[in-house]
Structure formats: C-alpha cells, structure tokens
C-alpha cells in the first residue's frame, strides 16, 4: 500500500450507489502475504470522512456460528487516497485499510471479516490456507478484462467460479481496467467480481493500462488505486517503482513469478534469476502482461526486450508455463528444448499462452504469427473474437491446462507430464472437438491501439 495526499472532498454526485465509499467496508481484496500456508492480507475501502479505526477478525471456520467467539481481532493500517489526480473522478478522498493475517495453520479453513469494530462489519468470508505438501490444487487465469467490465467481463469471472469453485487463487494478467486512475472503472471491476475478490486469493499482474491515465490526469503513472487496494509482497532488492508489481508466490510445490513487462525489464532479470535458482519446486510458472509471441503485434520493442532478457532464463531453468495477455486474442504454443545450435525436434520445454477475458477483441495477424516458427514456437491452438478463462491444475507429475469460453464451453486442453528427477517433460494435446474460432475475413494487419 502507498500513501497519497488528500484535498477537498467531492460530493460523489452522479455516481451509482455502489461506486460511492461509505462507512461500510467494500472493495475487499484478499492477497497472499508471506507463506501461503500461514498468511494472507486483506484490503478494503471506506469513505474518507470515516474517522473510526478499522479492524479485521479471523478464526478457524466451523459448521456453526460459534467460531466467531474465538475470533482474533487485528487493527488495520489506514491510508487516505486522493482521487482528485483525475478530474473524471467524482469523489475526493477515500480510506483504504489493510490487515495482515499471520501464523495461520496450514491447510485449514478460516473465516474472516472486516469493519469498524462496532456495528459496521462485512459478512464472514472463508478461505483455506495452503498445505505445506505438494497436494493437488488448481487456479484460474484471466487475460485482459479492461473494457465492458461490469456488463461483459462479469459473466467471465462468474462462469470461472461455476467451473472451478474450489480454485485456490485467481491470476489476473494485467489491464484489469482501461484508464488507470479512473475510479468508476475500478468500481465496475470490484462489482463484477463481487465476493470472489475476497474469497479467492487474488494474484494481480500490472498491465500497460494500469499506467495509462485519462486525458485530464496529471501523470501517466501507475494507477493511484493499485498500491492502496492491493497489498502485495515487496522485495527490497527491486527498484522502489517495481514494488508491489513484481513478486513471487510459492504454492504447494509451484513457484509462480509475477513480473512487470511495462518497464525496467533489464532490471528485473537478476530478480527473476534469483527466484528461478531456488530449489524445491515441482512446477515453475511465470506471468506478465505483454506477449513474447504476440499474435497481434508480432515483434515489438517490448517483446524483443523480454526475449533478450527473460526468455533465456525460462529455458535455462526449465520454466513450464508462461501466461500473458495484452493482445486481446488467444493463442497457445510450445517451445522445444534448445540444443547447442538449434532446437531439438520432438521435445517439449515451455508452454506459452496469450489470452483475453474481456469483450475487447483484436483479430489474429497471420503475417506476424509467421515469425513464431523461426523463434522456436510451435502454435497449437488459436482463437479470436471470444472471451476466455483458464483453469490450471497441478496433480502429482501432471500440470493440466484447460481454456474455456465465457459460455463455459471447453475450447482447449493439454497436459504436461514431468519427471521430477530429470526435469524432462512431455505434453499431451487433448483439444476438444470444437472448431477453432478463427475468422479469416476478420483477420489481417489492421492497426489498433492496445
């Protein structure tokens, strides 16, 4: 969480009731903090003129309401956020509160709530801590939400919940909104996800639209809401401007590394390698916003920087999966093992996925996708003009990947099987009998802003 100065309070005139901060907690967002087996962080919002202290309470959940008698109360940290940096915002200052849950028992169901310590509390919400063993688990993945968030992205995240209600966490690959500082867009994002943002542990990745302000904003800087509303891990070895945008989660045998592909790509390389060097993980997954293999833009300055700085480490440390967004289309491909002079045929090392979960869509560009082969990527499955979400599950020596359309239709599937002693892998394609959603008449080299 960051600190912001406050100015005169605006009235909130013209806003919908669920956009306006009040004395009641809203915009609750659960994140990892420290070891997922023993810690979490929760962040929420109240009105800027709310003067009372803020608290979180937590207890081991039970089948009846008596668990609440055993709840431990934690005083929250509070900061005021000035929304006046954008003249499109119709509220002045709001409060953001954060509390850290520590020393929890592993693989245990907990219930928590947040409030003022008096009459204004949230409902009790449950989550389960991670196991210290490599037990099977799954998580959901979302490419860009960005536009039409409440009207259209809401059905994607809700269908994901119907499909995988027991998911351990939700990974958002950037461009959660369109205009970084505009608060009504964040209001839509929180309303679209509703209780899921406080029940699923969230893993947000920063995208370029978290850096794009509106025309009246003072700066095109990181969204003023990002750090106040997401309490994320901080690595002091990283430059301060990367704090809470670059971090790592270790979950039940999986190492999940979240990077910031918007800036300081070279500066993140030492951090990335320091994390990948850590032993003891069965699976390694890396996520960031911009695509290495862009099905829309082809080779860009950003993709070249990632390919030069990060991709060699993906190969050196045998990364299993790379998850990305940005291109508003779908493609899944795979890269073989690189030999001394060339790629080794009939081998598999890393799966690359680019996806989109919101309604903004771009056509695939066959011209740019022709650059994939010489760079080592074999494209397996493509899609366009479709909203997707993914369910990814680790179980023993298998890492299963499934892509669903927002209707719930299974669109793509593959399973990686790994020998943990040798690191050698094979991939099994399990693509369902569903026609590939590619529309040649709509594809081409049309230019469009991200």
Report residues per predicted region.
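Short, solvent-exposed loop/turn elements at domain surfaces
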Residues: 37-41, 50-55, 64-67, 148-151, ...
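Solvent-exposed loop/turn segments at secondary-structure junctions
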Residues: 49, 145-148, 176-179, 208-212, ...
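Extended active-site neighborhood of metal-dependent phosphoesterases/phosphodiesterases
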Residues: 51, 95-101, 109-126, 184-280, ...
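Conserved, compact domain cores that house catalytic/ligand-binding motifs in diverse enzymes
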Residues: 135-205, 210-211
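Active-site neighborhood of phospho(di)ester-bond hydrolases with catalytic His/Asp-centered motifs
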Residues: 141-143, 169-175, 201-208, 259-260, ...
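The substrate-binding groove and active-site-proximal loops of carbohydrate-active enzymes
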Residues: 142-148, 173-185, 214, 255-264, ...
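Active-site-proximal segments of metal-dependent phosphoesterases and phosphodiesterases across multiple
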Residues: 279-322, 342, 371-373, 438-439
């Amino acid at each position: 969480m960051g600190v912001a100065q406050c100015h005169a309070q605006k009235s909130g005139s013209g806003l919908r009731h669920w956009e306006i901060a009040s004395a009641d907690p809203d915009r609750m967002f659960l994140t990892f903090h420290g070891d997922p087996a023993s810690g979490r962080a929760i962040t929420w919002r109240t009105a800027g003129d709310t003067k009372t202290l803020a608290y979180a309470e937590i207890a081991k959940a039970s089948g009846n309401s008596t668990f609440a008698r055993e709840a431990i109360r934690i005083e929250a940290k509070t900061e005021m956020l000035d929304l006046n940096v954008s003249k499109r915002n119709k509220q002045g200052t709001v409060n953001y509160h954060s509390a850290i849950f520590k020393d929890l028992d592993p693989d245990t169901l907990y219930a928590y709530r947040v409030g003022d310590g008096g009459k204004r509390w949230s409902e009790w919400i449950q989550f389960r801590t991670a196991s210290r063993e490599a037990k099977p688990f799954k998580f959901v993945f979302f490419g860009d939400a960005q536009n039409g968030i409440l009207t259209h992205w809401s059905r994607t995240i809700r269908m994901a919940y119907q499909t995988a209600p027991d998911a351990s966490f939700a990974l958002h690959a950037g461009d959660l909104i369109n205009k970084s500082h505009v608060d009504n867009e964040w209001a839509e994002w929180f309303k679209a996800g509703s209780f899921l943002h406080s029940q699923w542990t969230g893993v947000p990745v920063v995208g370029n639209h978290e850096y794009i302000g509106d025309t009246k904003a003072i700066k095109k800087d990181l969204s003023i809401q990002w750090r106040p509303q997401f309490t994320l891990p901080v690595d002091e070895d990283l430059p301060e401007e990367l704090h809470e945008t670059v971090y790592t989660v270790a979950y039940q045998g999986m190492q999940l590394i979240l990077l910031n592909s918007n800036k300081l790509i070279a500066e993140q390389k030492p951090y990335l390698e320091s994390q990948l060097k850590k032993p003891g993980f069965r699976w390694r997954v890396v996520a960031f916003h911009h695509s290495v293999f862009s099905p829309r833009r082809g080779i860009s300055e950003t993709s070249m920087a990632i390919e030069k700085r990060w991709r060699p480490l993906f190969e050196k440390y045998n990364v299993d999966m790379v998850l990305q967004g940005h291109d508003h289309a779908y493609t899944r491909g795979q890269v073989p093992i690189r030999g001394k002079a060339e790629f080794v045929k009939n081998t598999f090392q890393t799966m690359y996925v680019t996806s989109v979960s919101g309604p903004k869509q771009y056509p695939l560009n066959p011209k740019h996708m022709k650059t994939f082969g010489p760079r080592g990527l074999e494209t397996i499955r493509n899609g366009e003009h479709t909203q997707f979400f993914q369910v990814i599950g680790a179980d023993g020596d298998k890492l299963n990947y499934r892509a669903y359309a927002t209707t719930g239709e299974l669109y793509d599937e593959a399973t990686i099987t790994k020998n943990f002693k040798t690191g050698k892998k094979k991939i099994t394609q399990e693509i369902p009998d569903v026609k590939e959603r590619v529309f040649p008449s709509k594809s081409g080299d049309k230019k469009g802003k991200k």
